[in-house]
């Protein structure tokens, strides 16, 4: 059965993943998913849209694209583009109006957004990838797990080791010898030296 009401299709094309969310007219999420794109953005987006179609059937959609990798595709597809901080702050203001601070970890950057009296202020670390999604993935792969696996390790930690927090390169330099000594599940609850 075809549904002719207009649905919102949000597309976020980041440096490492493509994410989509399909909402009905009442802003209920009908479908959401993400996949790593491995520099194959169009194919990954097609795969996600196919999954959404398989779950929801034929729908009329109003798409919008955001994300660091989305501008070129938005122009190519003639779909509206919304800068990602505006997209995040607009969504949070609507869906979680009590929010005063939001932290977004991207694949290669980290952003913090402050909400104060109707004003939105954003700061971004785009210089170093330490603490971003890619860095977390790299650290997880060192101990042959994923980001979810890191959560499981953190739940059962037994010791805390100081790890450099200033830079991802220094953190990895601290982490690798600890892993080599067998300290796998002990690392991911470790604060930086200034927190210890």
PLM segments and residue spans:
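Acidic-glycine-rich active-site phosphate/pyrophosphate-binding loop
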Residues: 19, 62-68, 105-115, 168-176
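N-terminal glycine/serine-rich phosphate-binding loop of ATP-dependent small-molecule kinases
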Residues: 1-84
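Short, acidic/turn-prone active-site loops that include or flank metal/cofactor-
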Residues: 35-39, 85-91, 126-133
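Glycine-rich phosphate-binding loop plus the immediately following alpha-helix
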Residues: 120-155, 159
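A mobile "lid/hinge" subdomain adjacent to the ATP/sugar-phosphate binding pocket shared
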Residues: 154-187
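Single conserved hydrophobic/aromatic residue that forms the stacking wall/gate
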Residues: 188-196
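Conserved phosphate-binding catalytic cores of ATP/NTP-utilizing and phosphoryl-transfer enzymes
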Residues: 2-3, 69-121
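Structural signal for hydrophobic packing residues in well-ordered secondary-structure cores
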Residues: 37, 49-57, 96-103, 140-147, ...
């Amino acid at each position: 059965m075809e549904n002719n009401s207009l649905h919102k299709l949000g597309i976020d094309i980041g440096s490492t993943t493509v994410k989509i969310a399909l909402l009905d007219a009442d802003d209920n999420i009908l479908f959401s998913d993400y996949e790593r794109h491995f520099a194959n953005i169009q194919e990954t987006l097609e795969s996600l849209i196919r999954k959404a179609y398989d779950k929801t059937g034929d729908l009329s959609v109003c798409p919008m694209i955001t994300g660091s990798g989305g501008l070129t595709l938005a122009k190519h597809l003639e779909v509206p583009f919304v800068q990602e901080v505006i997209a995040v702050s607009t969504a949070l203001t609507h869906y979680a109006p009590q929010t005063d601070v939001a932290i977004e970890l991207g694949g290669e950057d980290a952003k913090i957004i402050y909400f104060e009296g109707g004003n939105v202020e954003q700061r971004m670390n785009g210089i170093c990838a330490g603490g971003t999604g890619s860095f977390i993935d790299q650290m997880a792969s060192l101990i042959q797990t994923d980001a979810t696996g890191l959560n499981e390790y953190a739940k059962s930690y037994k010791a805390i080791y100081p790890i450099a927090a200033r830079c991802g390169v220094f953190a990895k330099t601290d982490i690798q010898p600890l892993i080599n000594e067998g300290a796998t599940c002990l690392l991911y609850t470790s604060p930086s030296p200034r927190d210890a």
